Amino acid sequence: MSDQIDTRTAWLSPDLLASVRANVPLVYVDAIPVRVDESGRVTQVGLLLRVASDGSISRMLVSGRVLYGERVRDALIRHLEKDLGPLALPKVPANPAPFTIAEYFPDPDISGFVDPRHHAVSLAYVVPVSGDCTPTQQALDLAWFTPAEAASAKIAADMTGGQDRLLRLALAHVGELP
């Protein structure tokens, strides 16, 4: 078993991960990084530019797997810092609650949320960040948009896998869907 799981990081071997993806839904987190004003109103939405699971270059949310033995809060912080840099300073509550749950399937007709690799259940959060955000890891760019720009058809056309729908749900949740 030790050759299948790195117990220090809870990562599965590539072969075991492929087997799990083929047979078991995985738990993910999606995070919409936002900047807020002094009253807490969302003024900007951060979107990454990266290679999506379908191979396209797309605007995307912060997203990633929750590791075995990892708290959801810790997974959120890990993925936010991995994609936005260690100085992003995300404001994640002690016990975060998702604004929605998105189920990603290889088949686009099931839920409208698509990941060609597997079935994933993703807890979605809006997370204010107050620090210096710089794209890292696989992200090619990070751009900040007003809520109206983020909800536009132009941005939706640059997104894939149904993440534009998740972004609009997030904007509605914070009262910023135009």
Please provide the spans of the model-predicted regions.
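A structural signal for short, well-ordered beta-strand segments
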Residues: 31, 76, 125-127
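A structural signal for the main folded, soluble domain(s) of proteins
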Residues: 32, 81, 106-107
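Conserved Nudix-box catalytic region and its N-terminal flanking loop in Nudix hydrolases
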Residues: 40-89
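Nudix hydrolase/Nudix homology domain
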Residues: 54-59, 118, 124-178
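Acidic, metal-coordinating catalytic segment for phosphate/diphosphate chemistry
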Residues: 1-39, 114-115
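Active-site segment of metal-dependent pyrophosphate-handling enzymes
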Residues: 85-133
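Residue-level signal for short segments within beta-strands and strand-turn junctions
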Residues: 33-35, 49, 129
